[in-house]
Amino acid sequence: MSEQEEVQLPKLGKAPQVRVNGKNWKETKTPFRTSSLSVPLKHRSWERRQKERENLRMIKAKEKEMKDEKEAEHAEKVRRIKERRMAKEEKERLEKMTAILSAKKLARRKRKEKRNKLLRERN
């Protein structure tokens, strides 16, 4: 072959890009074009989006309020249960104390009666 002959390659519209990661079988992504969107998605006005965002904020605020209310009710229920248990424990403690005190009182009376009986028998 002579040096003057040039090899002509077919002209392609665009040279294919070689992927760095080697995943050449995957489809190459194209930039997002809004002109290809459907009409309802393309013509969403700023005011409409703002209104939707505001509605979403209101819904979330209402959900949070309901959740907080439910949590407060639960906390109140737990507090009442704890108070009831504490009152019951206090009542049981007082009953034990009165039982112990009355037992001591009974013992004192028995000793006193025993003394009186002994004194009566002597006389």
From Swiss-Prot:
Keywords: Coiled coil, Nucleus, Ribosome biogenesis, rRNA processing
Any one annotated GO CC term: nucleolus
Subcellular location: Nucleus, Nucleolus
Coiled coil region boundaries: 47-105
GO BP term, pick one: rRNA processing
InterPro entries: Cgr1-like (IPR005579)
Main location: nucleus
Family: Belongs to the CGR1 family.
Free-text function comment from the UniProt entry: Involved in nucleolar integrity and required for processing of the pre-rRNA for the 60S ribosome subunit.
Protein name: rRNA-processing protein CGR1
Native species: Yarrowia lipolytica (strain CLIB 122 / E 150)
